[in-house]
């Protein structure tokens, strides 16, 4: 008969959700589980396939075709910009960081909007930017959106929550994934997409967010602080409940401003962003190999 080798199969595990669907944070010990794979193995990243992992929009949300895989054989142009960097705190707790450097430094690289579907997953937060010559007027504040798959985003635009093609949303020409900038615990991707789809079609008088960033961040984190009027009246919080925005300037200088609500802090941060000009510092070319 001879010896017969058993065929070894590999089981694929979807990512374990670490977010509380209720959006309520609890002070408790969390245990993380990490899986390490050899670089010699072909690791096919399937997280961008919403049907396989149940990331589907509820009724009323247009069906999202399967997102393109992250592994595509084409050239991605990665841009590094000269832009204002921020960090934000509530009391002593860091709640937002758009600062490079350090072990948890933010990646501020941007890509052409045509390249974003290859690096996005449903539920991702996107920041869309406008690059323009220095001779023109300053660009508007960065536009935020929730990626729902198939090159589609849901966003608050011109007083309406709508679903648009990524290439048409705000007519931006570059963008990036900004999931890690806010330090709150995220909801699972399916709930992020449901939050966004569940508000499609709302108009100004029905909307409780004052800008695209607050709406997109609420979809991902479920924090009422992102809503207009979602916190106690100004001036009644103790210092440990107030917000502080740090603007990181050149030569390691930092300007700090205090706010009574997250809504006010975000408004000021976006005002500073809109008043500056984005200038390309460095252009990198990254080849992404097709591993399929």
Swiss-Prot record:
Keyword Phosphoprotein among record annotations: yes
Family: Belongs to the LRATD family.
Organism: Mus musculus (Mouse)
GO cellular component assignments: cytoplasm
Positions carrying Phosphoserine: 38
Intracellular or extracellular location(s): Cytoplasm
Chain's gene name: Lratd1
Protein name per Swiss-Prot or TrEMBL: Protein LRATD1
Positions of the LRAT domain: 133-228
Key words of the record: Cytoplasm, Phosphoprotein
Any one GO BP annotation for this protein: cell morphogenesis
Job of this protein: May play a role in cell morphology and motility.
